[in-house]
Amino acid sequence: MMDFYNGWLEESIRIEKTVNEAPRVARGKSLNWVRTRQDSRAALMIAPETGFPTGGSLLMRAEIPVGWHTGKHIHGEEAIYIERGEGFLLLDEKRYDFRRATVFHIPYRSTHQLFNTGNEPVSYLSGLAWHLEAFIYMGHMEQIEDAGQNDSAGLAKVPREESQYWPTDGRRISIHEEQFDLSTETKHGATYFLMGRSGKQNGFKATAVAISSIFVDLPHSKSHSHAHPEAYLYALQGSGYSEIGGKRYEWDQGDAIHVPPGMMHHQHFNPTDHDMRELRFEYGIRYWIVDQWKGYTTIDRHMKATHLDD
């Protein structure tokens, strides 16, 4: 009979094999859309349920029909990007308006709900660390209201937005595209910081999950190359390919790219005549492990974006 220690050794081998053989790209055109109590239409992209070996995190896409709202619930931290549409977020009974490219950070266990007040469906991306929270038996999710049609009389009673900040401790809740912070870095054609790599930039206070930045890769160029623990990219615009762990992975607008846990070297390439834009999600668990061993410190091989032929 196998003892517990040999079981651990075998588990270590299995983990490495799983990460090496796992998918790297979630295809936006092949998603399994479902209706849930929270969303009229939602699909997991990068998640354990879809075969990705994440560090307890996930990326989801969801849509809110015209004249509808999401459910109202509470759970751990969440980072949201509005890909299309307009409306507002109610967070702890305070209103925060949104439009295309607005980014939200939902504090831990704050009640929240999204409302579509525009003339087209709202499409949004959501990053969560639900699986990690559940694994350590601290995952609490509570549904207060279900998704459904807006009540016009109720909407009329909602006060106007007062601030983009949370009155509880002053942290930032929302940021709009014109407020993104253009960096002087040369690792891509351009880099815009949102919550930043620490999750603390531009007034945010993200711990478990952050939308750190947007990368712009120019036509016929390649990004810098490096290795670090887990991160996600979502293709906002354009098409290209990434080299991760020595293998090439093609992707198009609407796809999501998974740089898995570990230290796989990776680089992103734009072989087209148009700009590429990638939205970057990162999760705080990576810094917990980075602080324990210098082998997980980011390793940069090429510090600047260059032409494809260089």
Which stretches of residues belong to each language-model region?
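Ligand-binding loop in jelly-roll beta-barrel domains
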Residues: 53, 99-102, 108-135, 261-288
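Short histidine-centered beta-strand/loop micro-motifs
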Residues: 48, 54, 69-74, 115-117, ...
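Short acidic-glycine-tyrosine-enriched beta hairpin
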Residues: 79, 93-108, 246-262
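A short, N-terminal "cap"/entry segment at the start of jelly-roll beta-barrel domains
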Residues: 1-55, 139-208, 293-297, 302-310
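C-terminal functional regions that serve as terminal interaction/effector modules
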Residues: 210, 233-234, 247, 256-271, ...
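Long compositionally biased, domain-poor regions of proteins
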Residues: 113-116, 199, 215-225, 234-235, ...
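Glycine- and acidic-residue-biased ligand/ion/polar-headgroup-sensing regions
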Residues: 65-66, 75-88, 92, 218-220, ...
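Conserved short histidine dyad/triad with adjacent acidic residue
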Residues: 41-47, 58-74, 195-200, 211-227, ...
